[in-house]
């Protein structure tokens, strides 16, 4: 599954997510089409069994987050990452 996460708290979301799940995550600067506020789009690929726990974690960090879930047909490359510590 692929998550597209729209948040104003990218650093906090990424830190919480990476420290617990050790998956890669990408961050892109964005501007809200309605609010015109600066925000961020985060993209990551997860296993379906992780979905509920990850959504809960992200919502704890940012109560205003928007999370769009896509079914991923195929995924190639490293899935689990070694800790950066």
Where are these regions (language model features)?
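Positively charged, small/polar-rich N-terminal and surface patches that mediate targeting and assembly
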Residues: 1-85
